A protein has these predicted regions:
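Transmembrane helix-loop junctions in multi-pass membrane proteins
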Residues: 2-10, 28-35, 53-67, 88-98, ...
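Membrane-interfacial loop-to-helix junctions in multi-pass transporters
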Residues: 12-19, 71-76, 136-149, 278-288, ...
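Helix-loop junctions at the membrane interface of multi-pass solute transporters
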Residues: 88, 93-100, 153-180, 184-189, ...
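Extracellular/periplasmic helix-exit of transmembrane alpha-helices
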Residues: 119-135, 190-268, 304, 349-354
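Loop-to-transmembrane helix boundary motifs in multi-pass membrane proteins
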Residues: 187-194, 260-262, 281-290, 295, ...
């Protein structure tokens, strides 16, 4: 849903994100067949092509003949993402998932380190209040309990059940030695926490009025610009139609109103920091680079999550018929992938057509399920330690 809201009616963002798919496949073929073992070469090619994709997106956005191919509604993009998720789950891991994950790691770490340097140079003022009306359940965007929504904000930055699924299924197949686990597992979560802090800073340096104008769903604030501004001003946050129109123009978008999901507001925050530190005339380029940066690693979550879900489902189906449990049997792969994609695809569809942007449906479900998975993973880890006669380490889990 985050990716859909970032790309809808945005030819620049859509073309850039779409370009990352053939780039990842090219890198996969390069490392497997063309130049096996030449990791640095493949990395350089992939990163350069990703940066070129951002620049080419601006050319497409300014081309009347080409922009129509990438200017799509949220519903069209949702169906496209569902089809993509199915194909990604069926393809061999080396072809798309592994190179996309690998490239996204470099882009993610490089961008966040770059962002941290820019923040250190600028020392921007935090403009978001320490707490909003949401803490007492009255809004501003919607009313609801702090719990489980607090878990949404810390999901990847502190403890994540989804990461537990990936680290128990995909990651073990990619490591050579158990001694590598602390650096990958613990180091990975430290970096996730670092990413979470940088993302929070990028969002909080925006004027609250601008932040809420971007993040408020149409079902809450309306669809007309004046109606949206009036609603946000009534919450006590100052913003004007002229401000929002100018900001949209500066970042190369037709509008930024009701672009929920977090990706557009984070991209605006990151772009503002980068532009103030390294050149304001590149604001649009920074914005779409940030969108690409977010979409690339969010799509890796989609790839990995669907594949892990397929493995788990095949494992269960194997109890009904042995062939269904074979992860190399194509009919079983297709069936399990279709079921898993249908499940999350349904919620994506509901979120897209929901005038509130899925905030009352998807996000509570995510917050609850993610932490429940984490609790289960820690319980399983504790049981394994005890069974392995390593009870002295059980306090860790």
């Amino acid at each position: 849903l985050v990716v859909v809201n970032a790309m809808k009616n945005s030819p620049w963002a859509t073309s850039t994100v779409v370009a990352t798919i053939p780039i990842a496949i090219l890198v996969g073929f390069y490392m497997r067949f063309i130049r096996p073992g030449r990791v640095l070469e493949a990395t350089a090619i992939g990163v350069i092509l990703l940066l070129m994709a951002v620049y080419m997106g601006s050319i497409i956005d300014n081309s009347e003949s080409m922009r129509s191919y990438f200017d799509h509604s949220g519903l069209f993009l949702a169906w496209s993402l569902i089809i993509y998720g199915f194909i990604a789950a069926v393809l061999p891991i080396w072809m798309l998932l592994a190179p996309r994950d690998y490239l996204s790691t470099f882009v993610k770490l490089g961008t966040i380190i770059f962002l941290a340097i820019a923040i250190a140079i600028l020392q921007p003022e935090i403009k978001m209040p320490a707490v909003t009306q949401f803490v007492d359940g009255s809004g501003p965007i919607f009313g609801g309990s702090v719990f489980p929504f607090v878990f949404i904000t810390i999901a990847c930055g502190a403890i994540s059940g989804f990461h537990a699924l990936i680290s128990s299924g995909t990651t073990p197949k990619l490591i050579d030695n158990e001694r590598h686990i602390p650096m990958i597992g613990y180091g990975g979560m430290l970096l996730e926490a670092f990413v979470a802090i940088m993302a929070m800073v990028a969002a909080c340096v925006l004027e609250p009025g601008i932040y809420f104008a971007i993040n408020s769903p149409a079902g809450v604030v309306g669809t007309e610009a004046n109606e949206i501004i009036s609603k946000i001003n009534s919450w006590g946050y100052s913003v004007t139609v002229e401000q929002m129109n100018q900001l949209a123009k500066d970042v190369g978008e037709s509008t930024l109103f009701a672009r929920t999901g977090g990706a557009p507001s984070l991209a605006v925050g990151m772009a503002t920091i980068f532009a103030n530190a390294f050149g304001k005339h590149l604001l649009a380029l920074w914005y779409h680079f940030a969108i690409m940066f977010e979409a690339v690693f969010i799509l890796t979550t989609l790839d990995s999550g669907t594949r892990v879900g397929r493995f788990m489902l095949q494992d269960m189906l194997g109890n009904l018929h042995p062939k269904l449990g074979q992860t190399s049997w194509l009919p079983s792969i297709i069936l399990a992938s279709f079921i898993v994609v249908s499940c999350w695809g349904y919620f994506l569809y509901i979120g897209v057509i929901d005038p509130n942007g899925g905030v009352n449906i998807l996000w509570p479900l995510f917050g609850i399920a993610n932490q429940m998975l984490a609790a289960i993973a820690l319980s399983v880890g504790t049981a394994i330690l005890i069974k392995s006669d390593k009870i002295k380490f059980a306090w860790i889990t």
